Amino acid sequence: GAVAVIALDDQERVYLLRQYRHPVGMYLFEPPAGLLDIDGEPAWQTAARELAEEAGLEAQAWSVLVDFFNSPGGSSEAIRVYLARDVTPRSGGRIATGEAEEIDLPGSWVPIDDAVALVLRGEIGNPTAVVGVLAVAEARRMNWTTLRPVDTHWPVRDHLMETGRVRTDVAPRH
């Protein structure tokens, strides 16, 4: 499984990274995201760590925004997208991880409505970004009543773990 973060600032802009993805040979707009690869780490803490590592940001308010399957026709990957608010730059910037993919991740703040327009024009195509951007726009339209607490149970992930549809042999990070 994996987590992603839609970071929202006080001007209702979302933070998106531009990351090169070799399988499609393109740079894609993406939210900060990562695998649930530290045994025992709560999913929202993984999301907070990824926000710090990839964007150099931290947030005071966290909610579950949306859960989805990335590509259920060929993968069991379940993704939980968190909404991070009260976002500020992390003192010291990004956390250095030594991971090559995180060395140069340019990011920018995009107004929610502009991000939705980019999705609908096909200019944002990463599935996590598409789902996250549309979900945050809908959550805002619903006056944030659709948000769930950060520690909301994730039964789909439990099901996948119990049925052996999730790899549990991922090398732990130290």
Please tell me what each predicted stretch does:
Residues 71-92:
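Active-site-adjacent beta-strand/loop module that shapes the phosphate/pyrophosphate-binding cleft
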Residues 56-57, 124:
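Helix N-cap/coil-helix junction residues
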Residues 58-65:
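A short coil-to-beta-strand element that immediately follows conserved catalytic motifs
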Residues 7, 83-85, 109-111:
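Short, well-ordered beta-strand micro-motif
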